[in-house]
């Protein structure tokens, strides 16, 4: 069900900081016409930490309605409160999402038993497919491969992982422990090519907010074994992949999307707008990728 390039969607804001629903829906339509393979609303790139619960749920509802089953929608449903994560997953199911993306609990730093129990509780509470989101760089906890194996073996609705460890070896380890049908999606644009060569089936991409066509073509080439084409596409995208993370994300990718004319580059505090020097680097990366003219 899940493969290829799945965009970790930005959430556009109006000048007053409210969610720009019209722009969001228009942006989703453009993503689909560009050939994107799936969409992920209300995740980290969508500034979920600073969305209210009502806004979070509305963003998912808008996305599901606009997509209308044309591509899979994987709704962000993570929280460091297990009860809250259950509530968000239940809402995503009710809204019509195809799956949920659930991050490892951040800040409270549970051990492996706590991580297992968190996901087990969610899996028991909902029938919707669950994708684990393992991002130790932000959550400060790392789900062990053995924990992941136990979860996928014990709960059939835990179907895969968005792996943002940046550790290519993990792909082979998780493939060995969790099986070949366990969906492994890279969560790191910069290492995604190697990730897919090791057995991944795509990427939850930040860069695809501005380059959905290029990203979809890259992972289609990976799936067909055409790594010559994949490498050429990756070379075009790599400066962009790097530059959008010079400052805390999603400030960089929001600026890039705004540069293409889709939305404002407004982010919510504590995130702040980019420095001019960073904007210049992103501009050059967009030119290198052929997304804007010099």
From Swiss-Prot:
Location of the protein in the cell: Cytoplasm
GO molecular function: 4-hydroxy-tetrahydrodipicolinate synthase activity
Active-site residues, Swiss-Prot/TrEMBL: 133 (proton donor/acceptor), 162 (schiff-base intermediate with substrate)
One annotated Gene Ontology cellular component of this protein: cytosol
SUPFAM superfamilies: Aldolase (SSF51569)
Pathway where this protein functions: Amino-acid biosynthesis; L-lysine biosynthesis via DAP pathway; (S)-tetrahydrodipicolinate from L-aspartate: step 3/4
Keywords noted in UniProt: Amino-acid biosynthesis, Cytoplasm, Diaminopimelate biosynthesis, Lyase, Lysine biosynthesis, Schiff base
Domain of life of the source: Bacteria
Listed HAMAP family: DapA
Protein name according to UniProt: 4-hydroxy-tetrahydrodipicolinate synthase
Species this protein is from: Bartonella bacilliformis (strain ATCC 35685 / KC583 / Herrer 020/F12,63)
Gene: dapA
């Amino acid at each position: 069900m899940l493969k290829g390039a799945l965009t970790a969607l930005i959430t556009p804001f109006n000048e007053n900081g409210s969610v720009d629903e019209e722009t969001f829906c228009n942006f989703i339509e453009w993503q689909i016409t560009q050939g994107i393979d799936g969409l992920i609303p209300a995740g980290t790139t969508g500034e979920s930490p600073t969305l209210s619960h009502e806004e979070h749920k509305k963003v998912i509802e808008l996305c599901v309605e606009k997509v209308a089953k044309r591509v899979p929608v994987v709704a962000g449903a993570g929280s460091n409160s297990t009860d809250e994560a259950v509530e968000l997953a239940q809402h995503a199911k009710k809204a019509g999402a195809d799956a949920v993306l659930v991050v490892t609990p951040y800040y409270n730093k549970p051990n492996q038993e706590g991580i297992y129990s968190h996901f087990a509780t969610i899996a028991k509470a909902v029938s919707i497919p669950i994708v684990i989101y393992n991002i130790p760089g932000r959550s400060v906890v790392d789900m062990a491969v053995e924990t992941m194996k136990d979860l996928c073996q014990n709960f059939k609705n835990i179907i895969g992982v968005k792996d943002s460890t940046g550790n290519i070896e993990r792909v082979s380890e998780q493939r060995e422990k969790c099986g070949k049908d366990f969906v492994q999606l890279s969560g790191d644009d910069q290492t995604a090519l190697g990730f897919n060569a090791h057995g991944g089936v795509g990427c939850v991409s930040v860069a695809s907010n501005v380059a959905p066509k290029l990203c979809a073509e890259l992972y289609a080439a990976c799936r067909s074994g055409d790594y010559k084409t994949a490498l050429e596409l990756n070379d075009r995208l790599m400066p962009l992949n790097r530059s959008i993370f010079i400052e805390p994300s999603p400030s960089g990718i929001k600026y890039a999307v705004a540069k293409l004319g889709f939305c404002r580059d407004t982010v919510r505090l504590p995130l702040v707008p980019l420095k001019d020097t960073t904007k210049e680097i992103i501009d050059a990366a967009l030119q290198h990728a052929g997304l804007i003219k010099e």
